[in-house]
């Protein structure tokens, strides 16, 4: 599985925080997919899907925010390595009458993975949806943010047992609205 199972690698022997030294790791293709959702009133989701929000195109703005966030993760998470990102895909799809599902896939060729970048992309996408729609629905709930799948590196492939990962995910930019 992983050389560090059960060990907090961001702490040294004295318990002080440190950035993990990845210089001895191989440079490999790494990919991570995360997901989450925003729960809202059906009228809010309808407004988003029909493009009638007062602040503009919620889907396009949230997608761009998520992509930008993935690229800035190393600045936001203190011990996260700054990485060159090869690709970021963010999708937003309505599910039912009151749920906007978000997925982000991040790809790099590096010595460390992009799980945090994918999780950050989903989180900032959801926050942007909330920001753009809060005037009409302050009760929106950001929920279920999680890592669904990752590949590459020493720890190999991980797929969450209940992940709903589409085989073609990673390249699609079509949204269900």
UniProtKB/Swiss-Prot annotation:
Keyword Secreted: no
Matches recorded under Gene3D superfamilies: Molybdopterin cofactor biosynthesis C (MoaC) domain
Residues annotated to bind substrate: 79-81, 116-117
SUPFAM superfamilies per UniProt: Molybdenum cofactor biosynthesis protein C, MoaC
HAMAP family: MoaC_B
Subunit description: Homohexamer; trimer of dimers.
Protein name: Cyclic pyranopterin monophosphate synthase 3
Gene: moaC3
């Amino acid at each position: 599985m992983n050389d560090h199972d059960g060990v907090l690698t961001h702490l040294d022997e004295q318990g002080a925080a440190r950035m993990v030294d990845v210089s001895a790791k191989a440079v490999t293709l790494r990919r991570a997919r995360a997901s989450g959702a925003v729960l809202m009133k059906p009228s809010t989701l309808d407004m988003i899907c029909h493009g009638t929000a007062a602040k503009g195109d919620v889907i396009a703005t949230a997608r761009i925010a998520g992509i930008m966030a993935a690229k800035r993760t190393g600045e936001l998470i203190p011990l996260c390595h700054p990485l060159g990102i090869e690709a970021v895909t963010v999708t937003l799809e309505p599910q039912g009458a009151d749920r906007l599902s978000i997925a982000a896939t991040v790809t790099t060729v590096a010595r460390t993975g992009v799980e945090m970048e994918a999780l950050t992309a989903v989180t900032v996408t959801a926050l942007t949806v909330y920001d753009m729609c809060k005037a009409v629905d302050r009760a929106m709930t950001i929920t279920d943010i999680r890592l669904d799948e990752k590949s590459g590196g020493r720890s190999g492939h991980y797929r969450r047992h209940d992940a709903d990962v589409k085989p073609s995910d990673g390249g699609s930019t079509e949204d269900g609205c």
